[in-house]
Amino acid sequence: MSAPRKVRLPSVKAVDMSMEDMAARLARLESENKALKQQVLRGGACASSTSVPSAPVPPPEPLTARQREVMITQATGRLASQAMKKIEDKVRKSVDGVTTRNEMENILQNLTLRIQVSMLGAKGQPSPGEGTRLRESNDPNATRRARSRSRGREAKKVQISD
């Protein structure tokens, strides 16, 4: 535990002050206290904290050319993956209910899409409305099935003898 902070007050003799002087001094100190509290709430520095040295802030780490290229490649991959998912979703929605090849070709030839991708949605958290792709759903008619156990091998049965 740290020791309580000592505050030095100017030497004032209570005997020499009249009641009016003490009331005036109290009012002045209360207004100073209020002003200091507001300054602290606003994030301003008070006189006592400016004398305390703060920890030095380390300079930003320099970025090498290789690190820069790696970061660019990672960002591009994340954004491209997110864009591909969104494009697939929009294409599937636009051709939903199409039954003939001519209809499908006509829709795909005239298809225009606008998508928006951001790094916020690319970090693994799906953005709102994302993650509802057909093959990710629990629909039995989905294009992919859930992984199942191998049917070719039987599970080994272990017997423990006493």
UniProtKB/Swiss-Prot annotation:
**Compositional bias of type Basic and acidic residues: which residue ranges?**
151-162
User: Which InterPro entries does the record associate with it?
Assistant: Herpes_BLRF2
Q: What are the TM regions of this chain, as residue ranges? A: none
Q: Where is this protein primarily located? A: virion
Q: Name one GO biological process term.
A: symbiont-mediated suppression of host innate immune response
A GO CC term attached to the entry: host cell cytoplasm
Location in the cell reads: Virion tegument; Host cytoplasm
Record keywords: Coiled coil, DNA-binding, Host cytoplasm, Host-virus interaction, Inhibition of host innate immune response by virus, Late protein, Viral immunoevasion, Virion, Virion tegument
Q: Where does the record place a coiled coil?
A: 12-43
MF terms in GO: DNA binding
Q: Where is this region: Disordered?
A: 121-162
To which protein family does this belong? Belongs to the herpesviridae BLRF2 family.
Q: What is this protein for, i.e. what is its function?
A: Plays a role in the inhibition of host innate immune system by targeting the CGAS enzymatic activity which is the principal cytosolic DNA sensor that detects invading viral DNA. Acts by inhibiting CGAS-DNA phase separation: directly binds double-stranded DNA (dsDNA) in a length dependent but sequence independent manner and is able to form DNA-induced phase separation in infected cells. DNA phase separation of ORF52 mediates disruption of liquid-like droplets in which CGAS is activated, thereby preventing CGAS activity.
What protein name is recorded for this chain? Answer: Tegument protein BLRF2
